[in-house]
Amino acid sequence: MALKSLSEAVSLLLKKPLVWMPGMFAAFAILFIYYMYTLFGSSVALPIGIGLLVIFPAFLAGTYGVIVGDKSSSADFRKYAAYGYFRCLIPNLVIIMLGFLLSNTLTYILLMVGLSVDVALYFSIFLVIPLVFFFYFADITAMVNNFPAFRALKDSVVKVTTGSFHITAFYLFNIALFFAASFIFSAMWSLLAVDALLPISQMTQGEILALSQNELIALFMAPEILSSGFLALAVCASIFIPIVVSYKACFFKRNLLKLEAEPKAEEQQGSFDADGRWYKYS
């Protein structure tokens, strides 16, 4: 079922061009943030990036809606984007805040125990993985079922823990997509910045180890390397974000969406006429 959902998601990229919208917006946001950083610095680029990130759930909601609702017009996309914006935004904000709170709490505890900063940060970042794993379907659940944020989070946990093999296969395919995107990003970045990276590649191991942390950061923050990285990231985002979002919606629709069965006519209050047509009593 996970593989069928993936193949369906890929086919939707051709059948429904609107599912490309999250990737197109993400690519635009990445390049726009880069130009704002280049022209005005991080003090301007950071709030703009946060603002664009807050807008992004509208594109998620629109894509979820046209896939789950089996629609394809731009009017339907806008309708679902407006309807599901806060339903997608709030659960994701709760997850981010919860991850921030738990990771910082764990970092302080590990530092008090006596572990180094690097080890403490490693364990704190690793803590985010279970949150993503269990709450992955919270936003689409909140939108489709019109659940409040915390009920959507709970429902996502229930779906994940009771999904057995299909959920496991779904996450494995997502991990494979992540590694594919990482490989393509690294290859594109290296290809675009080959001239700037050539001096670094010719350095010996001893020369690299002799560099301070600030010197290493300065090397990789060179304009050509930085612009190549942002361009490669934008290209990968425009390709893989639509695949991942469509895959999530297709899998949810095929495996996790519980449609209520319509009540049978015999169980309703009404009667049949002489021609066998059913009339429900009001």
What residue ranges belong to the model's regions?
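Interfacial aromatic "cap" segments that immediately flank transmembrane helices
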Residues: 1-30, 78-101, 133-182, 281-282
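Helix-boundary and loop/linker segments of multi-pass membrane transporters
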Residues: 10-14, 37-40, 78-81, 114, ...
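Hydrophobic alpha-helical transmembrane segments in multi-pass membrane proteins
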Residues: 21-56, 91-112, 119-132, 170-197, ...
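A general structural detector for well-ordered alpha-helical segments in enzyme core domains, enriched
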Residues: 73-77
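Generic structural hydrophobic/aromatic packing signal, biased to beta-strands
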Residues: 116-117, 251
